[in-house]
């Protein structure tokens, strides 16, 4: 039976990079027989422009019924500070689908090491994953703004913490078997709970080493010794900051994918970069983050590990051959980059 994939096209460069990702998927499917169907939908600013909410009911329904969801990019300067913004649609989708676990792999391509702001010896061997809790904590707590006072409620349950830490251990089992749990337990009650739960979950994974780091120390280590990390797991706010810090290690956002997983429903796959409205429509956007997000989808949602590796190898060999878009020092267009990757599948 054909797998159902919802493609949320989004704003800015979203349509261009989504098309690139789907072209790679189509080329791969022709070689491997992967059977799927695509349900393309606008999302974010495009929905608001049509005088609708940023997450229409029909889009939510289609997403719930899908086997996987691809999202290109959302956001537009015209909505900065507006009461209704594209980002609200994404937050609502995460909450409605219970996309509690954000997975962001951080790996430096050998051919792109020169882009990193760190010295080559600092980034040698960097290959880790940030696992961020995505639907709880301060982002989804009560926000109270008074004239001369404000409060944001930071709230976690045992169950919310347990499931994200367990997810990190499951990922680590197939890697170097090291989990670094990041908190602020010397100050925050939620972090004291976090550390307690981490210790308890670790008992179920005797083959995996658990380490603890305070968030300020972890932020420094990510710059001074990033290769020490294997799997990082942390709460929503800390994960938001640290995952963005980790993206700087590669020197470009254009080659980094991400996934957001639920417990039972479909997962969502997206690049980590924004909608780049300044270059939208010019055909120069880097499609690699989107293409690698497709690879993550094939691996995580459909168990097609070799297909995912074929895409990753095609990306790596294309970069090594010097085929680079402008953001990473070359002149290749979106189409040329995509065609180079397809040719190497």
Question: Model-flagged regions — what are they?
Answer:
Residues 21, 25, 198, 290-301, ...:
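Buried hydrophobic packing segments
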Residues 45-48, 114, 222-323:
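Glycine-rich phosphate/nucleotide-binding loop
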Residues 49-154, 237:
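N-terminal glycine-rich phosphate/adenylate-binding segment common to multiple enzyme folds
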Residues 6-23, 27-28, 147-216, 228:
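Glycine-rich phosphate/diphosphate-binding loop of Rossmann-like nucleotide-binding domains
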Residues 33-57, 222:
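N-terminal beta-loop-helix "entrance" segment that forms/cooperates
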Residues 135, 139-181, 185-187, 205, ...:
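Glycine-rich phosphate/pyrophosphate-binding loop and the adjoining helix
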Residues 11-14, 67, 131, 168, ...:
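Buried hydrophobic positions in well-ordered alpha/beta secondary-structure cores of metabolic enzymes
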Residues 44, 111, 213-220:
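Short acidic loop-to-helix transition motifs that present clustered carboxylates
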